[in-house]
């Protein structure tokens, strides 16, 4: 089933396996797809003499991973091909104790402290770019905590199950039969959600750890990586404290405007940032969520969930921005159940259906063009009296027969039963007339909101909560610098963020040698 060239590459990946790995396969011999499923598993087993297969008879195809005869808690219902192929390879490597995605001791301790038996099911689409991160993070948790299991489910094979659960977006994670998470996520986010859902013993058992540095960079995107590297090159002790390396870059598919790099992907750029960071003596603490800060003293304090505290005389805030929501009543109820932010991931659920795209910038029009290829009808709603997208995109969308564009239109309400979206209410801003549009789904593309909540009560921010910086990236507080999309710098671009991060680091170093901090 797998191409010979791919199998050769996989052989190289598994060349260092030391544990005995068993793929325990359950299959229905009467299923017409049984031979294809079995062929896939046998192909994987053929890549290493450390991997073998065993077969059991059952209703549905699935297989679990055993290490030295013991269950790891990781299983797959469906063939983990497409974007999930990496999830399978990493699951086997991680089972053997290998892989750069394995967390540090502090995060592992939190995973081990989760309470009770935790049975996870992660519903995915094999074309979803956000799904592998979630599957891989939950697989790691299963390996660390024997009370956790995670089953990847190919939603395309189990449509009845998808409809019964009213899943309209992927990845969708269920814990012990109840919804836990929908959409993009990483180890840190998922761990926090599980701690809130099932409880944890960690807070009572945790040892409070204080880590001291010369410079602490908050955020691991282009601005944060640049700032950390520039600071480390000055011989300073530097730490990055971030939810994930790469930041929002991870959610970008194609990147063609990073000067000197003709074309790359967000995932690749995030990996390249980590590789570059690792070239220097920079301590990376990812999967961390900042819960409190004290930035007004000479020695700044940053506390993260899990009991760690970081202190330094200089802080660079490079926490980036997140997708802006509509800010409408009941919006939380419909996210993942009709309201979405990723057309690539969730668009396939709306094949042959009617959807709307809110936002007429480049992201919104690109989303409309993508969705037009699979949806019956796409309605684009732009708040302003003109679209802001590039002319070439406007021309393209105008040529599509199943796309309709409305300007000067404000979305005022989400309509539905609280579980499933059925439409939206919009207002024509030229005459204040309202009307309802029946829809199956809506994709929100209205820009970004700065991730400044942990700092906005201490440093000066704009009414939009962007951190105000001067030309040298200094904020209103001595020893506190900021860079990238979280700030007032115009034009939120990767190239600009990298330059801003470098400026912030150089300003911090300049203040240090002049005795300002």
Language-model-detected regions and their locations in the chain:
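FAD-site-proximal beta/loop scaffold in flavoenzymes
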Residues: 322, 327, 333-349, 438, ...
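Structural micro-motif
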Residues: 55-74, 159-176
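Thiol-based oxidoreductase modules, predominantly thioredoxin-like and allied folds used
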Residues: 49-58, 146-160
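Local sequence-structure signature of Cys/Sec-based thiol-disulfide redox active-site neighborhoods
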Residues: 3-42, 111-146, 152
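Glycine-rich dinucleotide-binding loop and its adjacent helix/turn
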Residues: 204-212, 319-374, 468-471
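Non-catalytic, surface beta->alpha helical segment in thiol-disulfide oxidoreductase systems
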Residues: 67-99, 174-202
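A Rossmann-like FAD-binding core segment of flavoenzymes
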Residues: 270-305, 309-312, 317, 372-471, ...
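Beta1-alpha1 glycine-rich phosphate/pyrophosphate-binding loop at the start
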Residues: 115, 121-126, 130-132, 136-138, ...
């Amino acid at each position: 089933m797998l191409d010979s060239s791919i199998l050769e590459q996989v052989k190289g990946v598994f060349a260092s396996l030391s544990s005995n790995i068993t793929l325990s396969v359950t299959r229905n011999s009467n299923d017409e797809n049984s031979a294809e499923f079995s062929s896939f598993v046998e192909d994987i087993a053929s890549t290493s003499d450390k991997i073998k297969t065993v077969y059991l008879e059952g209703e549905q195809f699935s297989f679990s991973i055993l290490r030295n005869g013991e269950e790891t808690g990781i299983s797959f219902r469906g063939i983990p091909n497409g974007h999930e192929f990496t999830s399978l390879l990493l699951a086997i490597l991680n089972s053997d104790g290998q892989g750069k995605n394995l967390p540090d001791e502090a995060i592992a301790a939190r995973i081990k402290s989760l309470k009770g038996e935790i049975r996870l099911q992660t519903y995915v689409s094999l074309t979803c770019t956000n799904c592998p991160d979630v599957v891989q993070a939950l697989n790691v948790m299963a390996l660390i905590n024997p009370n956790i299991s995670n089953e990847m489910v190919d939603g395309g094979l189990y449509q009845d199950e998808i409809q019964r659960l009213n899943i309209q977006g992927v990845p969708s994670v269920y814990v012990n039969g109840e919804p836990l998470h929908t959409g993009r996520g990483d180890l840190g986010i998922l761990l926090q959600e599980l701690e809130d859902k099932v409880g944890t013993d960690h807070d009572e058992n945790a040892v409070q750890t204080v880590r001291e540095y010369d410079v602490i960079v908050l955020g691991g995107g282009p601005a944060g990586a640049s700032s950390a590297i520039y600071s480390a090159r000055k011989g300073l002790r530097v730490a990055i404290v971030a939810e994930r390396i790469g930041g929002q870059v991870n959610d970008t598919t194609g990147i063609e405007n990073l000067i000197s790099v003709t074309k790359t992907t967000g995932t690749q750029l995030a990996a390249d940032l980590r590789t570059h960071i690792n070239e220097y003596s920079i301590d990376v603490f990812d999967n961390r969520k900042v819960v409190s800060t004290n930035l007004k003293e000479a020695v700044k304090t940053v506390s993260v969930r899990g009991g760690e505290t970081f202190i330094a005389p200089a802080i660079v805030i490079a926490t980036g921005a997140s997708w802006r929501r509509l800010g409408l009543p009941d919006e939380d109820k419909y996210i993942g159940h009709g309201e979405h932010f990723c057309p690539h991931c969730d668009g396939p659920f709306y094949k042959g259906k009617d959807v709307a795209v809110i936002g007429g910038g480049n992201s919104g029009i690109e989303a409309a063009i993508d969705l037009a290829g699979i949806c019956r009808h796409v309605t684009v709603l732009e708040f302003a009296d003109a679209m802001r997208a590039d002319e070439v995109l406007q021309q393209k969308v105008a040529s599509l027969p199943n796309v309709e564009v409305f300007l000067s239109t404000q979305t005022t309400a989400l309509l539905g039963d609280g579980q499933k979206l059925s439409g939206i209410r919009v207002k024509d801003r030229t005459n204040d007339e309202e009307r309802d549009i029946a829809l199956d789904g809506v994709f929100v593309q209205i820009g970004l909101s700065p991730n400044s909540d942990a700092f906005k009560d201490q440093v000066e921010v704009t009414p939009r909560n962007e951190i105000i910086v001067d030309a040298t990236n200094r904020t209103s507080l001595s020893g506190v610098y900021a860079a990238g999309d979280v700030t007032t710098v115009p034009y939120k671009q990767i190239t600009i963020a990298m330059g801003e991060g470098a400026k912030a680091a150089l300003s911090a170093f300049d203040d240090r040698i002049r005795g300002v901090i």
